[in-house]
Amino acid sequence: MAGLVDFKNEEEVKEYLDNLGTEYSYQCFKEKQPDGCNRLAEYLENIKKNFESAAHILKINCDENEHSESCYKLGGYYVTGKGGLPVDLKAAYSCFLKSCNKGGKKSIDSCHNVGLLAHDGRVNDEKPDALKARDYYIKACDGNFAASCFNLSAIYLQGAQGIPKDMNMALHFSEKACNLGHVWGCANSSRMYKLGDGVTKNDEKAESFKNKARDLHKMQQERTPQI
């Protein structure tokens, strides 16, 4: 069929990829499409392996267009120092915050990352901000990001500055993390029910969560490639 690329033909593949780059460049620079700029950055990163140019496009698209996915990706570049950018957690935090507040495919991941960076204090002169971390973990947990739900359970399990210990809330978020497939969410829920740790003791629920933790752990091991 005319127009289809023979992906076994090296010359056709090269021409196809070059045309993609031209198309995305046109979308970004001529048509001023934020989505086109994001596609161009992905093309530069994944096809051309030109991380410096990808970082440049991501920065423009995040700073000028506040494109959620580009801000998320740029935040990751700042975390690792990729694409010639300096390792700069405050810049990463700003990128993730934009992405989280903007919404989009990676906004939930970005909200979780804002929570992480606020939680460990490295973007606030080594002063953890548990309240801000909680607020952004809640946003991510509401979007069914399991790790954020688990981190919320840990905050309420131990208490933090400005956040009193609350075993009912700890159990609530631990159970949600478990239901989203987080092994330790299941394990902690099981333990709390087994010991009656701040909640009504319930051996049946303890066993149920224990079995779920075991099943999830087994599934994870099966998915992990064996050497």
Swiss-Prot record:
Sel1-like repeat placement: 34-66, 68-104, 108-145, 146-182, 183-218
InterPro entries reported for this sequence: HcpB-like, Sel1-like, TPR-like_helical_dom_sf
Cellular location(s): Mitochondrion intermembrane space
SUPFAM superfamilies assigned: HCP-like
Pfam families cross-referenced by the UniProt entry: Sel1
Keyword Cell inner membrane: no
One Gene Ontology term, aspect cellular component: mitochondrial intermembrane space
Keywords, alphabetical: Mitochondrion, Repeat
Domain of life: Eukaryota
Function: May be required for assembly of mitochondrial respiratory chain complexes.
Family: Belongs to the hcp beta-lactamase family.
Protein name: Cytochrome c oxidase assembly factor 7B
Organism: Xenopus laevis
Annotated gene: coa7-b
